[in-house]
Amino acid sequence: MFGLTTLAANKLPLGNMLFIIISFLVLMVILKKVAYGPLTKVLDERAEKISTDIDGAESARQEAENLAAQRQSELADTRQQATKVVADAKASAQKQSDALVAVAAERANTINQQAQTDAEKLKEDAIANAKNDVAALSVAIASKLMQKELSLNDQQALIDAYISDLETK
């Protein structure tokens, strides 16, 4: 056969050839048990770790996106609340301003009414004093007139004065 003729041509004894083949096969079995098994195990573990890391990175990316969306939502809510607080403060300030204006207007109205009342009282007092003065003056004039005889012109002047006094009242 092929193997025997080749061996004869190379002058390698058959026993040596069998020993080399068996040694090679034993070496392959030992390598498979000692090196290939652990090597494939390490490679499988490495592939699993890479897969786990990729899944973890994807999960972290998704969580980061969710947190970013949540932060954006919270920021929008905070801005809306700040806008509402500012609007409420403006409305409150406007209400206080309106209330102060109303109080000031009411106070001014009260002061105006009091001034009108005081003016009316002063006017009435002045009229009463004037009446008293006119009465006193009339009595004085009458007493002087009684002391002297009235002429026609004096009588006419007295009547005109009396009529004009009545018209002013």
Curated annotation (Swiss-Prot):
F-type ATPases have 2 components, F(1) - the catalytic core - and F(0) - the membrane proton channel. F(1) has five subunits: alpha(3), beta(3), gamma(1), delta(1), epsilon(1). F(0) has three main subunits: a(1), b(2) and c(10-14). The alpha and beta chains form an alternating ring which encloses part of the gamma chain. F(1) is attached to F(0) by a central stalk formed by the gamma and epsilon chains, while a peripheral stalk is formed by the delta and b chains. It is found in: Cell membrane. The keyword Cell cycle does not apply. This is ATP synthase subunit b. The keyword Transport applies. GO terms for molecular function: proton-transporting ATP synthase activity, rotational mechanism; proton-transporting ATPase activity, rotational mechanism. Disulfide bonds: none annotated. PANTHER family: ATP SYNTHASE SUBUNIT B, ATP SYNTHASE SUBUNIT B', CHLOROPLASTIC. The chain crosses the membrane at residues 11-31. It comes from the Bacteria. Keywords: ATP synthesis, Cell membrane, CF(0), Hydrogen ion transport, Ion transport, Membrane, Transmembrane, Transmembrane helix, Transport.
